[in-house]
Amino acid sequence: MAVTKIYIVYYSLHGHVETMAREVLRGVNSVPDVEATLWQVPETLPEKILEKVKAVPRPDDVPDIRPEQLAEADGFMFGFPSRFGVMASQVMTFFDNTNDLWTTQALAGKPAGIFWSTGFHGGGQELTALTAVTKLAHHGMIFVPVGYTFGKSMYEMGEVKGGSPYGSGTYAADGSREPTELEIQQANYHGKYFAGIAKKLKKRSPV
């Protein structure tokens, strides 16, 4: 059986989304005949600003991705922090540079999922996801939400938990809060669930 290639493309300023991305990677790679690759969205902020906001160093083992490289994959998981209810400007800029792919609809019919980090309740856990879907729609990609398939943990009220039916998520608070065990579990499940859907779509594709 042909391998289904999933690109996990993320941007992380303080490390929270990176943590989620690596767990999504484990989930995707747990599905037979599916292979995931981690990619970073290029940074757009100058070093002086990054130092001021105490950005964590970018990992050396995850290369930056160029827009045209998206065409190589069978599906995508995009991860990003929220800024004022939308994806961070670095990810916005990356999508703005996919015009050539949009012109040819090179990504049409390919599945895509999303995961994210916000500061607090009301910081965009669902709004960020909803606004991100517009990028996928204009490319003709198939949005794959996680729904409530994660089970009873989706209804957890005993602790703070990010994520929603749109995808997995976490809260960063002032930057000191790290993804919880439950959020990590959901990210892993999300990757596994998405990989299963992407694999089915590739198998049924006439191309």
Swiss-Prot record:
Its EC number is 1.6.5.2. It holds the Pfam family FMN_red. It is an enzyme of class 1 (oxidoreductase). GO terms for cellular component: plastid. Binds 1 FMN per monomer. FMN binds at residues 12-16, 114-167. Disulfide bonds: none annotated. Residues 6-194 form the Flavodoxin-like domain. GO terms for molecular function: FMN binding; NADH:ubiquinone reductase (non-electrogenic) activity; NADPH dehydrogenase (quinone) activity. It catalyses: a quinone + NADH + H(+) = a quinol + NAD(+); a quinone + NADPH + H(+) = a quinol + NADP(+). NAD(+) binds at H14. InterPro entries: Flavodoxin/NO_synth, Flavoprotein-like_sf, Flavoprotein_WrbA-like, FMN_Rdtase-like_dom. Keywords: Flavoprotein, FMN, NAD, NADP, Nucleotide-binding, Oxidoreductase. Its cofactor is FMN. Belongs to the WrbA family. NCBIfam families: flav_wrbA, PRK03767.1. Catalyzes the transfer of electrons from NADH and NADPH to reduce quinone to the hydroquinone state. PANTHER family: FLAVODOXIN-RELATED PROTEIN WRBA-RELATED, NAD(P)H DEHYDROGENASE (QUINONE) FQR1-LIKE 3-RELATED. This is Probable NAD(P)H dehydrogenase (quinone) FQR1-like 3.
